[in-house]
Every structure is written in C-alpha cells, then in structure tokens.
C-alpha cells in the first residue's frame, strides 16, 4: 500500500520517510551524560522548545508544582558553578553555555495521604526528563545534575520562599567525542534484572 500526502509543492511518500524518523527508543538510547561542550550558545528557539517540553510534562493530580529558571548568562552560570565547585569548568558546570534550574513550589505538589510523600521530587524529575529528551532531539548534549548545594542555590538565585531547587539540567552542543552506545549498554542492567518477578 502506498500513501501519498501533498506537502507544499511536493508529493511526499510517507513509506520512504519511515526509516528516516527516529523513534523514542532510538532517541533514548542515543542520549548520554555529556560533560564537554562546544563554546557556542544555544539558539533561543531551541531553548524555548526545551522549556515547552518541561511545561507540558505530567504531574501528580495535575498540580504542576514545577518551575524552571533558565541560566544562560556568564553571571548566572558562574552562580550555578558555585553551587558545586567540583564540577566547575570555564565559568559554568562542565563549561556548559546553558543550564536549567528545575524547582518545585513544594506546597503546591500532591501529597500521598498514606505516608505524606510529597510528589515534588517525582514531578520535577519528569519535567527534567522531558526537557532532557527534547534537548537530545534538538541535537544538544545534556547532563542531569542533582549533586549541588540546594540552600546555596536558593540564595544565589534568590528563589522565593517555598520554592525548592531539585535538579540542574546542563545543556549545550556536545564536543566532538560521542559516547559509545555499546559501552553505555554494557553499564546498563540487563532486562532480566530490571523486571521484578
């Protein structure tokens, strides 16, 4: 069966395009923690697309407690690096030109009644993951950083009362080297261990 769709002045054969479209699993497998970036800024349209991916992320009971701060100036990047000096490089974390600080208005988050678990950690993690995958789709490298001093981040970025920082998503165009997918697969637990029976 052949399926044709008019597109502008062209006729596009969708079956021909099938092999060109990356599926989600391919995208997820291509992602790796990037810690070296090119010395160039990320275009505003790309930043906007990544933020939008986070904005539409699901949350417990649709409470949407997550908030995102875009750190893309030398001053803001330096402040981010001060929250974890171990990762500081070239005035940023890993020298990245762009960092998203992902926070939660914790009082707005859903609380599980049986044990009072606040969903902020989960909700912000979903936001971070969706932003990370959109960044990958846009050709950026990313590194999800939780190892930073949250109280210092609150102070450095003058976060309002009740807003707590959970993650930093470090982004930029990756340096020439690319992580070996086979090596990454070797470090990932096998399916037989992943599934509980």
Could you tell me what each predicted segment is?
Residues 46-51, 56-127:
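Glycine/small-residue-rich phosphate/adenosyl-binding loop
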Residues 104, 147, 173:
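Short secondary-structure boundary segments
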Residues 67, 148-150, 167:
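Residue-level "edge-of-site" marker
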């Amino acid at each position: 069966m052949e399926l044709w769709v008019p597109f502008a002045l062209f006729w596009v054969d969708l079956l021909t395009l099938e092999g060109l479209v990356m599926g989600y699993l391919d995208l997820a497998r291509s992602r790796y923690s990037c810690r070296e970036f090119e010395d160039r800024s990320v275009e505003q349209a790309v930043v906007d697309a990544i933020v939008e991916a986070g904005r539409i992320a699901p949350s417990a009971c649709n409470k949407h407690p997550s908030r995102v701060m875009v750190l893309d100036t030398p001053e803001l990047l330096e402040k981010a690096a001060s929250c974890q000096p171990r990762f500081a490089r070239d005035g940023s974390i890993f020298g990245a030109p762009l960092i998203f600080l992902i926070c939660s208005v914790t009082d707005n988050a859903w609380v599980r009644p049986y044990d009072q678990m606040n969903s902020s950690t989960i909700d912000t993690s979903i936001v971070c993951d969706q932003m990370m995958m959109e960044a990958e789709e846009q050709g950026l490298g990313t590194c999800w950083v939780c190892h930073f001093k949250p109280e210092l981040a609150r102070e450095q970025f003058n976060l309002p009362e009740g807003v707590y920082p959970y993650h930093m998503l470090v982004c930029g165009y990756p340096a020439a080297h690319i992580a070996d997918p086979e090596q990454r697969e070797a470090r990932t637990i096998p399916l037989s261990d992943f599934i509980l029976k």
